């Protein structure tokens, strides 16, 4: 499977299902790559998969694609030492890949069943940008006949908050779109904050759409619970202590990074994500359970070992 074919397959997966997370599309693409690979050794197969992950990261520079690809590779590679026969080993790797994919496809449902219990009747919720997991949680709350209203930031520069507002209107949920700059003003009106995450880092902090950090700071200042909902395939081996520690490959879009390689100055560009420290987060709802930020490192070690 050539690079061009790999990218085309990845983009077709994304286009075919708008609700599919980019990491899930990447894992489906890697599974298809695994099935079509013509290699004859396990070492060669691993090298080809690693190169395929790098190719996908060059197309979509989000944290989730990087962490999802690495976790997929680790999960299927656990069998490589068990069988000496290559064809048998590859067959088991494909089976494990399909098992991994089926597990992560249930992630949002598990998270929604855990988190919606924290939404009380009459709650006023603040959220940020467009998150498929947050939307799934709110769908579950609607199905449970809970009455609540949502404030959502417009989320510049792509106005993804308006996309979220439109989705919530279809659920007949009262929605108010607010300016990104109005987070501090609106915070006193809300009961809780729920956001998604592009990546969950080793210390229990998160990397998410730009503006998440300021929302967490305001929530902490006004003693409002700040909840994060994220699938476990977004757990990434990264330990940032501040904004500068987040790698540029995650901060900026892939197209922006290519233009920088061509000589353009990165100082003129706005980052797409920021880092929120664990001290600002109340709880994380994942398919592994409800975690405190301090418990994330233990779960991350289990995933990557």
UniProtKB/Swiss-Prot annotation:
Subcellular location field: Cytoplasm, Cytosol
Inhibition and activation profile: Activated by the chemical integrated stress response (ISR) inhibitor ISRIB which stimulates guanine nucleotide exchange factor activity for both phosphorylated and unphosphorylated eIF2.
GO CC list: cytoplasm; cytosol; eukaryotic translation initiation factor 2 complex; eukaryotic translation initiation factor 2B complex; membrane; plasma membrane
Pfam families linked: IF-2B
N6-acetyllysine modifications at: 35
GO MF term set: GDP binding; GTP binding; guanyl-nucleotide exchange factor activity; identical protein binding; translation initiation factor activity
Main localization (coarse): cytoplasm
Alphabetic keyword roster: Acetylation, Cytoplasm, Initiation factor, Protein biosynthesis
GO aspect biological process, one term: T cell receptor signaling pathway
Family to which the UniProt record says this protein belongs: Belongs to the eIF-2B alpha/beta/delta subunits family.
Record text on subunit structure and interactions: Component of the translation initiation factor 2B (eIF2B) complex which is a heterodecamer of two sets of five different subunits: alpha, beta, gamma, delta and epsilon. Subunits alpha, beta and delta comprise a regulatory subcomplex and subunits epsilon and gamma comprise a catalytic subcomplex. Within the complex, the hexameric regulatory complex resides at the center, with the two heterodimeric catalytic subcomplexes bound on opposite sides.
Role this protein plays: Acts as a component of the translation initiation factor 2B (eIF2B) complex, which catalyzes the exchange of GDP for GTP on eukaryotic initiation factor 2 (eIF2) gamma subunit. Its guanine nucleotide exchange factor activity is repressed when bound to eIF2 complex phosphorylated on the alpha subunit, thereby limiting the amount of methionyl-initiator methionine tRNA available to the ribosome and consequently global translation is repressed.
Protein name (Swiss-Prot/TrEMBL): Translation initiation factor eIF2B subunit alpha
Naturally occurring in which organism (per UniProt): Rattus norvegicus (Rat)
